[in-house]
Amino acid sequence: MHPSDQTIFALATGPLPSAIAIVRVSGSRAGEVLTALTGSLPPPRRAVRCDLRSRDGDLIDDGVALWFPTPASATGEDVAELHIHGSRAVAAALIKTLSAFEGVRPAEPGEFTRRGFENGKLDLTEAEGLDDLIHADTDAQRRQALRQLGGVLGDRARRWRDQIIEALALVEAGIDFSDEGDVADELMGPARAKIAELSAEIAEVLAEQGRGEKLRDGMVVAIAGPPNVGKSTLINRLARREVAIVSPHAGTTRDVIEIQLDLDGYPVTVIDTAGLRDSDDPVEQEGVRRARSRAAAADLVLWLSTATDASDPDVKGPEVWRVRNKIDLATGEVAESGPSQPVFRISAATGEGFADLLRELTRFAAQYFGSAEAGLITRDRHRRLLADAAASLTRSLVPGLAEEIVAEELRASAHSLGRLLGRVDVEDVLGEIFGRFCIGK
């Protein structure tokens, strides 16, 4: 029996113990399983309280059962849901009973969603939106994921693909009537106009500069500077907990420490790097090398120094802010020199000036992400396939190109959009996409 023909089950809720747990069953034998456990099939889509019993008749739990007959279910198959008390023993007894049914097996990660995809309940971009929703850490990420799950990109791609196929039909009709010049011209003219319009529309989406991808991946802020200037104290204050060791001895931090922040709904990763200095210690040298590498790759660098040190930052990056720390210990201010980067005076230990720095970080994040929720593209896969589709459309518009070549380019463009939606040639990416889902989803 092919794995997709088997009935699957899994715990669909979080770690046990918990108030309740939900076990989901999907496949052709779901109704048989539900009847065996409860004695009868409940009315479709109605929660019914029932006794759940093993095949020997022993009581497993007093629970609730729901029945979703095909095709009106999340997977497009017969689906049963069993709501039980969230006890490890109860869940184990139910799973043991389910495992005893012939043709019924535990689900693989993401298999419920994959079956929904294969049965036309959602396209591949919507499945990716569901994955993003599951992994969303901030409110902005949640809203973007819901838009993708709702079909904001999939609906647009379907419309583009349908219009390309319409244009292709006109081109192929023009080829059929190539002996009748006037008829062929009348068909090719509207086709080229439609192609040009679609090409411009897809190009506009590609020009979004990765807003959706930025929101999905987050912004990276690196804290860099000489040893013993308070970098670990600052990251602890940003995290509102102790994540880095604070020591008066220089060189305490030798590896990169990361924390995740939610700045007004925007996802930000802050990294605490090793102090930058010359050292004979091979371990510290490696820490310094990593620190410079991570700072150079960051979207923003906070160059931390003491309040009396006005030297220029010793790192490169797209945006560098100078942060003068330990102002609570300083006896006076020093004049700033060098490039006109923002300068903040704080005490990471007492919190003085920290609110101003945090406010500017939040403002910078808002500018960095822009109106990210308006972006359609949230993954590199989307961008590559849309770029392929757009390139084929552009080539089809080359003046003097033979109609047969135009038709071939349009087929290639439609094929790229089909891959985007998961309609054609996507077996190589399905395992990667659905493998990210948890078991039971």
From Swiss-Prot:
Residues 218-366 form the TrmE-type G domain. GTP binds at residues 228-233, 247-253, 272-275. SMART domains: AAA. InterPro entries: AAA+_ATPase, G_TrmE, GTP-bd, GTP-bd_TrmE_N, GTPase_MnmE, MnmE_dom2, MnmE_helical, P-loop_NTPase. Pfam families: MMR_HSR1, MnmE_helical, TrmE_N. The keyword Cell cycle does not apply. Its main location: cytoplasm. GO terms for biological process: tRNA methylation; tRNA wobble uridine modification. It is found in: Cytoplasm. Keywords: Cytoplasm, GTP-binding, Hydrolase, Magnesium, Metal-binding, Nucleotide-binding, Potassium, tRNA processing. (6S)-5-formyl-5,6,7,8-tetrahydrofolate binds at R24, E81, K121, K441. Its cofactor is K(+). The keyword Cytoplasm applies. Binds 1 potassium ion per subunit. Mg(2+) binds at S232, T253. Homodimer. Heterotetramer of two MnmE and two MnmG subunits. Exhibits a very high intrinsic GTPase hydrolysis rate. Involved in the addition of a carboxymethylaminomethyl (cmnm) group at the wobble position (U34) of certain tRNAs, forming tRNA-cmnm(5)s(2)U34. PANTHER family: TRNA MODIFICATION GTPASE GTPBP3, TRNA MODIFICATION GTPASE GTPBP3, MITOCHONDRIAL. Belongs to the TRAFAC class TrmE-Era-EngA-EngB-Septin-like GTPase superfamily. TrmE GTPase family. NCBIfam families: mnmE_trmE_thdF, PRK05291.1-3, small_GTP. This is tRNA modification GTPase MnmE. It comes from Rhodopseudomonas palustris (strain ATCC BAA-98 / CGA009). The gene is mnmE.
